Design a protein with these regions (language model features):
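Active-site hotspot residues in diverse enzymes, especially metal/ion-binding acidic/histidine motifs
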Residues: 1-260
Length: 260
């Protein structure tokens, strides 16, 4: 699980990002140059499309700190997204999990906490690279308006969550030595806007981005199971699809402490 970022620890997070930036930038470029992967222009929809190929499960889990995970069952990687979170968070989490699937060589085969923590930070940087490229340029070119309204506009255009936008802009502020912007970001970084959908509406923005989708969908996994049965009819561990899915759901609820 990714660390909770606050105004108090944002500088240490930026320091970690700087240490891994070149590696993550190379990984981002490698993916973006692959025509077999970059099939659609919409980055959020592309992320979901990629995960569907791995048997994506989408389901609402009432835990705001649990955005998603990768489960390994019978040697197969299965991504899960929490649809009880706003769509913007789901899109960011999707790219986070794609990093783990494609580039993470640590988290699935050993449990060295320091290495896993670094991989989580790399996954966050990768997601930001895929969704928030040039957000700083867009931000500084916006006309004069309330500071938070500018952040909401960035969220809408880049389809990214509130704190991810702030973190990218804070990195820009530090690089450009813009102390005024850095200070302003810290002042509002920890503010939680319960009325964010209403604020989006007032700005003429689509508020569905900041609302949960509550999608329940395991069809990608079911199709993957079906293909496995056709390809390997001699194997029997996929025979009972319902039991297979139920076991995964049980693990999810155990991890989120919502079930036994």
């Amino acid at each position: 699980m990714s660390e909770l970022i606050t105004a108090a620890n944002i500088d240490s997070v930026i320091k970690k990002n700087n240490e891994i930036r070149n590696e993550v930038s190379g990984q981002t470029m490698k993916l973006q140059m692959n025509p077999a992967i970059m099939k659609v222009a919409s980055r959020p929809q592309l992320a979901l499309l990629i995960l569907q190929g791995f048997g994506l499960i989408q389901m609402p889990i009432e835990d705001k700190f649990w955005s998603g995970a990768i489960f390994v069952k019978n040697g197969k990687i299965i991504p899960v997204l929490n649809t009880a979170l706003p769509r913007a968070n789901q899109y960011f989490t999707a790219w986070h999990e794609i990093y783990h699937i494609i580039f993470d060589k640590v988290s699935f085969d050993h449990f060295i906490e320091r290495d896993n923590t670094i991989e989580e930070r790399k996954a966050e940087c990768f997601a930001a690279s895929m969704l928030l490229a040039d957000v700083d340029r867009y931000f500084i070119e916006l006309p004069e308006m309330d500071f938070v309204s500018k952040i909401f506009l960035c969220m809408s255009v880049f389809q990214a969550p509130y704190k991810a936008v702030f973190l990218s802009l804070y990195e820009y502020a530090i690089r450009s030595e813009n102390e005024t912007l850095a200070k302003r970001i810290k002042e509002v970084f920890d503010v939680e806007f319960e009325d964010m959908p209403q604020r989006f509406q007032e700005l003429g923005l689509d508020d569905s981005l900041v609302k949960p989708s509550y999608v329940v969908n395991a069809s990608s996994l079911q199709e993957r199971i079906r293909r496995s049965e056709v390809t390997n009819p001699e194997l029997n561990y996929h025979k009972d699809n319902e039991e297979f899915l139920k076991n995964i759901m049980k693990e999810i609820f155990m991890i989120t402490r919502k079930g036994e």
